[in-house]
UniProtKB/Swiss-Prot annotation, chain A:
Disulfide bonds: none annotated. This is AP-4 complex subunit epsilon. Belongs to the adaptor complexes large subunit family. Residues 690-712, 725-867, 880-912, 919-938 are annotated as: Disordered. Residues 728-744, 853-863, 880-891 have a biased composition (Low complexity). Keywords: Coated pit, Golgi apparatus, Membrane, Protein transport, Repeat, Transport. It is found in: Golgi apparatus, trans-Golgi network; Membrane, Coated pit. Residues 764-779 have a biased composition (Basic and acidic residues). GO terms for biological process: intracellular protein transport; vesicle-mediated transport. The keyword tRNA processing does not apply. HEAT repeats lie at residues 118-153, 154-190, 192-227, 234-272, 321-358, 359-395, 397-431, 454-495, 517-556, 562-601, 874-911. The keyword GTP-binding does not apply.
UniProtKB/Swiss-Prot annotation, chain B:
One of its GO terms (biological process) is protein transport. Keywords: Coated pit, Golgi apparatus, Membrane, Protein transport, Transport. GO terms for cellular component: AP-4 adaptor complex; clathrin-coated pit; trans-Golgi network. The keyword Protein transport applies. Adaptor protein complex 4 (AP-4) is a heterotetramer composed of two large adaptins (epsilon-type subunit and beta-type subunit), a medium adaptin (mu-type subunit) and a small adaptin (sigma-type subunit). Interacts with EHD2. Belongs to the adaptor complexes small subunit family. It is found in: Golgi apparatus, trans-Golgi network; Membrane, Coated pit. This is AP-4 complex subunit sigma. Subunit of novel type of clathrin- or non-clathrin-associated protein coat involved in targeting proteins from the trans-Golgi network (TGN) to the endosomal-lysosomal system. It comes from Arabidopsis thaliana (Mouse-ear cress). The keyword Membrane applies. The lineage of its organism: Eukaryota, Viridiplantae, Streptophyta, Embryophyta, Tracheophyta.
Amino acid sequence: MEQLKTIGRELAMGSQGGFGQSKEFLDLVKSIGEARSKAEEDRIVLSEVDILKRRLLEPDIPKRKMKEYIIRLVYIEMLGHDASFGYIYAVKMTHDDNLLLKRTGYLAVTLFLNEDHDLIILIVNTIQKDLRSDNYLVVCAALNAICRLINEETIPAVLPQVVELLNHQKEAVRKKAIMALHRFHRKSPSSVSHLVSNFRKRLCDNDPGVMGATLCPLFDLISEDVNSYKDLVSSFVSILKQVTERRLPKSYDYHQMPAPFIQIKLLKIMALLGSGDKNASDIMSMVLGDLFRKCDSSTNIGNAILYECIRCISCILPNPKLLEAAADAISKFLKSDSHNLKYMGIDGLGRLIKISPDIAEQHQLAVIDCLEDPDDTLKRKTFELLYKMTKSSNVEVIVDRMIDYMISINDNHYKTEIASRCVELAEQFAPSNQWFIQIMNKVFEHAGDLVNIKVAHNLMRLIAEGFGEDDDDADSKLRLSAVESYLQLISEPKLPSLFLQVISWVLGEYGTADGKYSASYISGKLCDVADAYSSDETVKGYAVSALMKIYAFEIASGRKVDVLPECQSLIEELLASHSTDLQQRAYELQALLALDARAVETILPLDASCEDIEVDKDLSFLNGYIQQAIESGAQPYISERERSGMFETTDYHPQDHHEVPTHALRFEAYELPKPSVPPQASNELVPVPEPSYYSESHQPISTSLVSERESSEIKLRLDGVKQKWGRPSYQSTTAASSTTPQAANGISTHSDAGVGSSSSKPRSSYEPKKPEIDPEKQRLAASLFGGSSSRTDKRSSSGGHKPAKGTANKTATVPKENQTPVQPPPDLLDFGEPTATTATAMDPFKELEGLMDSSSQDGGSSDVMGLYSDAAPVTTTTSVDSLLSELSDSSKGNSRTYQPQTSKGPNTKEALEKDALVRQMGVNPTSQNPTLFKDLLG
Amino acid sequence: MGIRFILMVNKQGQTRLAQYYEWLTLEERRALEGEIVRKCLARNDQQCSFVEHRNYKIVYRRYASLFFMVGVDDDENELAILEFIHLLVETMDKHFGNVCELDIMFHLEKAHFMLEEMVMNGCIVETSKANILSPIQLMDKAH
């Protein structure tokens, strides 16, 4: 279809400058334009690389030719290939006296080089020279280059000249000099800290372009230090007022809106200045109110300004009237049919909800519509809003929705974000532990590889600590439900590693606790896990430790342990593992199986993961033993430090247990288990408070494969075994010692930050769940917003806004025309005038978007184009009549007809000539990629 | 920082103009452009003209076969950027007359010159078409 439309269409080639380009260049562009695949394009570019490499070495290349080569280099890089072989030629071209060539050279250099490239040094000199030029365009070109190429080191080389140029008589130079200073400020604030007053000065520049540009650096400065600029509040307000009163030249108008981009920048600055400042906010309120009244909400640009006003109001301390106006604007956005406006509305809602929490309620149905919209962007924005308005009454609905969405997307970046939001909300507002575990399971199952490892530890801790204080029954229920859910999930293929770690841990701790599942059943499952994820050593380690716990509990309770054959073979395999960690675990397990019930119970007491382990660093409990040994003739121990007199070595010697080595050597791993032997069940310990030790060991667990990784659980119980495998003197003693009991229970000394805070919260409240899985929107609305709404509400509201929309469209044209006469006499430089008035009759955007619709649909689009040719006045400045009629013509035949009403008569003619020229050169519109010739605005 | 990059890419995913306001290596650019184009192409005209991509927000607008895509920071006013794109197209149209994809290809440097006038340091600094085009016209005259 597209081809049909374009075949025979005239080439509307550039009207400017003629075709200086060579046939070769035209051919290159043509072939790139016609390339049908990336591979084809790559081939073209690669052969172009070869050609240019040769050409550039030729002697005496004419300048024009050279310029063309440079552009071809730009093409090569733009299409993703390396053109570094030609950089030097671009650098050379910046030296040229000819302005066009110089500027092309600068352009290429800024595209090719980053600010730290070695070649830049060759350009600084040229820049310095150009800054002194009499031709202001040369100065501008140099300033452009400065904004891209000058880094911290080279700032001093050009700074004095740039400062001088701030007073240049040409406004274009002043503007660019300001931006150069802006760049310096970004690169190295200290280099221009003595010059910031210049930005204030330029704010009063009598050229609006300079003033507008100055707002950019001022915005940066003010965001860094609001208080130093409070005196400018009234200046900004007055500038904004003047802009809205159309005091700027008309050439800054955009779609009848006076200097909208300057207005937006001003509003951004005002938001900064008015934040938390009642006084400043009051000064602004007048002009903001005016903006709300004046802004034409039928154009995109008008809405852009309205949206910026909403943002501003959400930052400052607004009066109730402004809030109301903002709320009104938001509701208009939300009621619009345009997704863009809905998006802005949702965003605005999210901002305003901070100051007036009730505002969301009246828009609940619109919000839900957006949430259910297939448009991903809108959906995400809505989730952001929901995230902001989550409270304990609606957390279940919101998090459920988020999780469903999380499951449905593939984008890891966003998945991570939404997963962490789910976790955050669940931790903050969870109505019950049960629910929390469910949510965590889902998060782990579907995004386990993306969430922070702390989350896993939180979950384990929650399951271990349960509801806390008195409700043991509920605790075991919770654990059973966790175990059950894991047994269900465990056979799912490809679970994330982190989740498997949690599962293994919980199964090890509580798998058999309830008596519902047999040890062999659980251990079989654990073997399956170790087997299925045999490449994941962490998971295997967790699984083996879990097995050990299961067997320990069995032995301790006096039952006979039958090690399943698969477990046996797993253990044997791990005994020979390359991972010393796994090997150690396997040996420990093997050793444990040989111990008697009493010993095992001491090593791994039941459900003792939360017990605090007190470590007697001084090993005072050994005193008696040592005393005995010395008495029987042993040499007293002399520490390494004392022996050698060297400090450094000490840390490397395990014997020196008075200091936990800070080095990350293996020794640490051996020491870790020491704190564990936890006592809850047995009762003869001498605890020494040692909180920091605990936390120290707690952290690294997860992150590495080192054997300490599992310390959170295992640390508690390995010691008994450890004495056999660890360093004898040290380990054995710990084991013996740590059988010391004390009221360690319940006193939590963990300093692991994230864990503590989160696990305590969900515990606090258990609210009965509301049934919320009702598919109906109003139900959803009710659960989200807490308000009630009915179907009829919905209908009336949507019925209400459709007509409103229609009228909005109609009225759109009216006020515009009203406005035109009010405009001040056109200022110089306004080229857009003649057509602007005709364009007022229609919203150019509506038209354009309509066109875009039509061109995107493949079937029957030519007819649609025909239709649109009636409604042609599309752009303000250019008539598109010609294009559209050309389009419809072309669909009928290949002949060209002049369109008398085109405002671009001469251009069309010119285009025709160029067409002929281009055809001669071999660029033919009938070729493979006809869309090349399609007018962008058409 | 505001605007992080401006891309013009056609429906086939071929880059027609690329201007980055922060440094990315060739490979990064290639990958980024590919991902963005795929995302935008998958969307229909009723959907928002905004897409989130990594830590960028892409505001895009389609004219005939050509997508104009502007990568911005999260706190940028999307609607304003959308209109900025249109201003750019209008400006090019004013200069080239009935601007089409091929105009940009044949006059790549001029399209860049216009952008150089409009955007510096990732900020919109000039929005008057007359001011944007006057240096280019002067250069044309001189040749």
